[in-house]
């Protein structure tokens, strides 16, 4: 069994910047020649396990001695007996005093000059060799005249003479993986042949060996896999591959690059996850060597660093200090945190003026390495999850001791936070200047290279959560940079990412940002027509038939998309779907259907009718209405309906206060205000005659409801009046409609996917936000905005028909314009951005029909069609006809 031992200083360094670092490959280029890595036998004892970490071999030898000189003195052989008395040395002639001899290191290696006394033991010589080379005593064998020297013998007993030549070979141990050792040794040998050859021609052999080595890794036993993978490190394979990568010959560099990439990438696909995690020490070794040989910008180094980041994200890092059993420790990975933070900081500083900002790879790796670092620091240092700076000099056991272990890391982490936050503040400030320029019509790009800003801010917020007072600093900065922060949210927040950290601080965002995040929670509308949920509905039975189609469908089917068609009408497509949404929502919230009540002060606002719970079918209609509202939001259709605050807050899982009922019941609101503001003495005189009860009407009958135990006999006083008002409001607007709200929320949840997402949707919005999303714009339709967002097909803007059209529209009433818009697009209410917020621009299409025909529309495409009417009066007559409510709202009928 042979093993290739290198001559490189390899003191088990585990991080790029660890204290005991390895020399750069440039510094020991001569050491890395193939004549220093030679084949030698290695004997392994069955009872001796593989080392837990690679052994260090640092060769320090005389450069002049290239050959061993054999002694011509005594022919007496060294005794192999373990007993000194059995050695036949008594008759030998000995010269007492100092002795000089040579030890040739391994087969064909350098030679050491050893000075010793004749009575020194062989073991002491082994120890000198270890001090000089780093090769452990247990790994050495000394051969002289064909025989192995025993530790207990003296040099005199072995008949070592001046200028004698000894051969050092490695001790062979038994191993359970001889094929793996042979594979890697063959690969290392191949590499050194390539490095030594003047014109190398690399083959696929190295790649083949690496794939075979990975393929033979034990897949079911983590311990065996770890032992197996150690062979790769013990054989110095990473050093050999990096040496090949550092070769001045391009063919060698390409071969090494391909081989290392193959090994790193294939390990993740070939090995199961538990086994792949044992790969961490190998990747750390590659990172360390590549950093020294090629630098942190090298693509192969970046690949290894990213792979290590994905591992530490999964396995974490050890929280102990000095444990050899940990796969990855803090000191292994914190140098990567420092390196990446420095790189990101530099890139942020230049991104304000260049097209390139921090790279996605750097930011992703930074976040990956930070995850276990934050966990270890917080778990070990702060009992309450927050770190207070400056750190106290705690020297007691437990967390205080742990705190001292990571004092430098904690300080550095806080410095990283402050530095990156300052750089981000500068970037956001410059973004706002450019955003203002864009609003003025300038074409200046916002900030080139800003695509990673949001991810960096998210990580900074996560770091801030670990330090007392840091979050206040972070969110105050976000408040000052609200415009640029919101721009990043709208531009770069993606579906399926975690945005709770933003939604919890919605006050530092704009409506556009809050709407964007809310819409990301909703399912995405799919375009696969074969998976659409088809509905054929009679207009005269709109509500009941819609209920049957929606309430009894599987939620997954509804999330897949809708296909809508009215009976006896040929029109289909998105336009008809928009029309159906508008009319079915108007029917659901029609007070005559007794499901919802409108607010006295704002008749656009609705909340569940408390009396509707008496009918079980009504409760099912609340589930149906929850589904319909979620689908309308999902399809981005404004329906002209808004919720009252008491309804909205309950959907968000929040408490109801007195101020929240102002619109829903102004009479009760004023009464409660008076009770709370009355003189305490008057209240205590029982002038009001109130007790903790409520009189409620239900199905034309009155019912007395106690607001608390013994409510009938509990008099309202100045001390308990606040409690009375709170209980009264809770019963009127929470308890009385709890079942209806629960059914609506369940219907909404059916579409959105979970109750947590349902609450997050409403919690991330203000009531006014939902008004604008669900109801749409409340400002009168602007003809100028309409005109600016309309294209022409067949007509030119300068044609008289186009001029007549806009003049006629300009003189229409607000209601006529709404009807015309609905006829044209099936949209009754525009988005808050106006026509610019629609999915596409509108179009006036020139038809070839006769002049006596009315205009027609293709609502799916926002297209209005009419012939080139010969006069303005004729056009006005035709447009007046289609802007009658009964015509515009019945588009598509036969």
Which residue ranges define each predicted feature?
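Short, intrinsically disordered linker segments that flank or connect zinc-binding domains
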Residues: 88-91, 113, 794
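Short structural boundary motif marking the start of a folded domain
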Residues: 96-102, 112
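Short amphipathic, charge-patterned alpha-helical segments
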Residues: 115-140, 163, 584
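Long, Ser/Thr/Pro/Gly-rich and/or acidic low-complexity regions in intracellular
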Residues: 138, 358-361, 391-894
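Eukaryotic mixed-charge, acidic/polar low-complexity intrinsically disordered regions
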Residues: 145-171
């Amino acid at each position: 069994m042979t093993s290739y031992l290198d001559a490189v200083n390899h003191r088990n360094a585990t991080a790029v910047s660890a204290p005991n670092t390895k020399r750069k490959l440039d510094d020991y280029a001569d050491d890395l020649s193939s004549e220093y890595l030679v084949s030698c036998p290695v004997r392994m004892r069955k009872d001796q396990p593989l080392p837990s970490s690679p052994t260090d071999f640092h060769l320090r030898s005389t450069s002049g001695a290239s050959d061993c000189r054999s002694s011509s003195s005594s022919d007496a052989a060294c005794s192999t007996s373990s007993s000194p008395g059995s050695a036949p040395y008594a008759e030998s002639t000995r010269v007492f005093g100092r002795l000089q001899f040579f030890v040739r290191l391994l087969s064909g290696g350098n030679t050491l000059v050893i000075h010793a006394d004749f009575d020194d033991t062989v073991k002491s010589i082994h120890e000198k060799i270890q001090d000089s080379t780093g090769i452990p005593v247990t790994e050495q064998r000394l051969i002289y005249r064909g025989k192995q020297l025993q530790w207990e013998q003296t040099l005199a007993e072995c008949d070592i003479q001046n200028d004698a030549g000894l051969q050092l070979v490695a001790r062979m141990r038994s191993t359970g993986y001889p094929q793996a050792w042979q594979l890697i040794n063959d690969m290392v040998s191949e590499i050194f042949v390539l490095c030594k050859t003047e014109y190398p021609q690399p083959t696929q052999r190295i790649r083949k060996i690496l794939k075979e080595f990975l393929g033979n890794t034990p897949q079911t036993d983590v311990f065996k896999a770890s032992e197996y993978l150690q062979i790769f490190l013990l054989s110095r394979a990473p050093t050999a591959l990096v040496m090949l990568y550092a070769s001045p010959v391009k063919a060698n560099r390409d071969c090494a690059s391909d081989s290392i990439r193959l090994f790193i990438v294939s390990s993740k696909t070939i090995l199961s996850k538990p086994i792949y995690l044992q790969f961490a020490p190998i990747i750390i070794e590659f990172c360390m060597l590549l950093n020294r040989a090629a630098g942190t910008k090298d693509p192969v180094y970046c690949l290894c660093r990213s792979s290590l980041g994905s591992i530490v994200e999964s396995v974490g890092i050890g929280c102990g200090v000095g444990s050899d059993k940990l796969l990855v420790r803090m000191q292994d990975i914190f140098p990567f945190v420092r390196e990446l933070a420095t790189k990101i900081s530099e890139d942020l500083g230049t991104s304000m003026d260049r097209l390139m900002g921090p790279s996605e790879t750097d930011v992703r790796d930074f976040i990956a390495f930070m995850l276990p670092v934050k966990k270890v620091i917080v778990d070990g240092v702060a009992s309450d999850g927050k770190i207070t700076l400056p750190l106290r000099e705690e020297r007691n056991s437990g967390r205080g001791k742990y705190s001292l272990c990571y004092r430098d890391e904690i300080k550095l982490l806080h410095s990283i936070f402050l530095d990156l936050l300052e750089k981000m503040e500068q970037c956001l400030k410059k973004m706002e200047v450019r955003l203002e320029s864009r609003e003025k019509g300038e074409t200046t790009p916002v900030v080139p290279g800003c695509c990673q800003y949001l991810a960096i801010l998210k990580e900074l917020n996560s770091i801030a959560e670990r330090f007392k007072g840091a979050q206040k600093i972070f969110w105050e900065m976000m408040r000052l940079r609200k415009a640029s922060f919101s721009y990043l949210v709208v531009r770069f927040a993606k579906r399926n990412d975690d945005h709770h950290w933003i939604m919890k601080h919605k006050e530092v965002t704009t409506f556009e940002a809050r709407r964007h995040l809310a819409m990301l929670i909703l399912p995405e509308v799919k375009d696969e027509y074969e998976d659409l949920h088809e509905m054929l509905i009679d207009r005269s039975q709109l509500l009941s038939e819609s209920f049957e189609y929606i309430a009894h469908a599987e939620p997954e089917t509804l999330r897949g998309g809708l296909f809508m068609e009215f009976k006896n009408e040929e029109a289909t497509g998105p336009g008809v779907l928009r029309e159906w949404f508008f009319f079915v929502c108007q029917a659901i919230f029609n007070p005559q259907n007794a499901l919802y009540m409108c607010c006295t002060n704002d008749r656009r606002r609705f909340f569940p009718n408390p009396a509707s719970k008496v009918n079980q079918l009504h409760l099912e209609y609340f589930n149906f209405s929850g589904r319909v509202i979620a689908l309308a939001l999902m399809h981005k259709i404004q329906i002209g309906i808004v919720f009252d605050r008491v309804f909205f807050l309950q959907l968000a899982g929040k408490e109801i206060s007195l101020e929240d009922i102002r619109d829903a019941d102004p009479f009760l609101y004023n009464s409660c205000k008076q009770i709370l503001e009355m003189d305490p003495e008057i209240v205590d005189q029982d002038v009001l005659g109130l007790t903790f009860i409520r009189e409620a009407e239900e199905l034309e009958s009155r019912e007395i409801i106690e607001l608390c135990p013994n409510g009938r006999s509990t008099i309202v006083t100045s001390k308990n009046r606040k409690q009375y008002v709170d209980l009264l409001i809770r019963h009127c607007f929470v308890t009385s409609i709890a079942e209806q709200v629960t059914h609506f929320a369940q219907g909404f949840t059916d579409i959105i996917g979970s109750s947590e997402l349902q609450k997050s949707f409403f919690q991330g919005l203000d009531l006014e936000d939902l008004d604008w999303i669900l109801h749409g714009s409340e400002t009168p339709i602007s003809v100028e905005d309409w005109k600016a967002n309309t294209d022409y097909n067949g007509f030119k803007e300068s044609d008289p028909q186009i001029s007549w059209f806009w003049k006629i529209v300009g003189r229409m009433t607000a209601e006529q314009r709404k009807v015309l818009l609905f006829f044209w697009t099936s949209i009754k209410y525009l988005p808050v951005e106006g026509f610019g917020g629609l999915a596409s621009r509108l179009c006036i299409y020139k038809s070839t029909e006769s002049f006596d025909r009315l205009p027609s529309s293709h609502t799916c495409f926002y297209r209005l069609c009419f012939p080139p009417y010969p006069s303005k009066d004729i056009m006005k007559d035709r447009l007046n006809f289609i802007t009658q409510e009964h015509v515009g709202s019945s588009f598509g009928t036969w």
